[in-house]
Amino acid sequence: MRQPEGREVVIVEAVRTPIGRGHKEKGYYKDTHPNDLLGKVYTEVVSRAGIDAAEVEDVIAGCVQQFGEQGFNIARNAWLQEGLPIETPGTTVDRQCGSAQQAVNFAAALIAAGVHDAMIGSGVEHMGHFPFAAGMKTQEEFGFAFTPALMAKHNIVGQGLGAEMIADQWEIPRSELDELAVRSHKLAHQATEEGRFEREIVPFQVNGDTYVSDQGIRPDTNLEALAALKPAFKPDGKVTAGNASQISDGAAAVLLMSAEKAKALGLKARARIIDQTTVGCDPVKMLEGPIPATTKILARNGMKIDDIDLIEINEAFAPVVAAWRREHNPDMDRVNVNGGAMALGHPLGSTGARLITTLLHELERSDKEIGFVTMCCGGGLGTGTLIQRV
């Protein structure tokens, strides 16, 4: 592995909310403001670390749909709403589904460069209040992001159709996609039953109810039921509601410091950031980013895929995982070992920090050393973060 340039950056703490279904009537958080979700993980990550919140020099939050309740810099709003120090600034970033992972990566880079000593990388998304249709309605009123000039160069389509293109290019059968979905639910249910998520989850109270586990897991999911689902994006397609990620609500936060700062505060460094990357890829298929992101991380660190003990690849759509598996041939017993977004859910701007949080805790639980997170992102992007437990 390469030695990172600049100062060593360590993860001190990482937490997340239970992930709720993004359902207007049945979702955990149907009556919850996204500020409350993000604010909760801010308060908890500081409390668990046992530090004065004033030690945090900046907070970065990922969020995709930044308008309405999630507008006007939700990172700052959630921090202030919790009564945390006004001297700590905040900013909100959008790298589509990789937004929270990018928030963590940006924080790590700033610490490595010596700009700050302690930061929080985080993310939030309330898809129950902000379905994809909400963004389209806003564009209908205020103008469309994809101009004719852009579309002339890249005929951008929805992510579901991009997933179908990937399934076609890599000749992935529908049965393989459904098998990945069943695997995700089975592993997520097993992890929940065994209490694997308990340390990372912050219990969340709403209207007298306390939620401590993820809402979207369906332990009875089976191949027969999935095979009966209709294609979601084209009549003869392979991608369905069952082999794609769920519409979800949630938040996650990761507290990072320089190794020197953590030592000065008497804190245990739980992992260090070895490397990070972001890549661009075809903006039409758009979801193959984890393939080159993984290639780049491996090459730059002189590693093989088998050198990584645990991998979290976001299950935005099953074809993303299937194509990545074909290209990199990983041991799947090391991949998404506690399930993924098809079972747990995918609150867009939050998932990257959630994946890093889950990876950290699983490295500790299973006594493993090297972990990697990679995600596909809208617009043709891929993200990667390589960590080492210490």
Language-model regions, residue ranges each:
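Condensing-enzyme catalytic core mediating Claisen C-C bond formation in acyl metabolism
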Residues: 2-32, 224-288, 292, 299, ...
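N-terminal extracellular/periplasmic Venus flytrap/periplasmic-binding protein-like
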Residues: 15-18, 30-40, 48, 176-264, ...
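Conserved beta-ketoacyl condensing-enzyme motif
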Residues: 28-143, 201-213, 284, 305-327
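Conserved catalytic cysteine-centered active-site region
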Residues: 32, 63-117, 153-159, 220-246, ...
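Short, well-ordered amphipathic alpha-helical segments that serve as non-catalytic structural scaffolds
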Residues: 34-50, 74-78, 103-106, 160-166, ...
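Active-site-proximal alpha-helical scaffold in enzymes
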Residues: 93-125, 167-197, 253-260, 326, ...
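Active-site pocket-lining segment
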Residues: 164, 200-202, 274-343
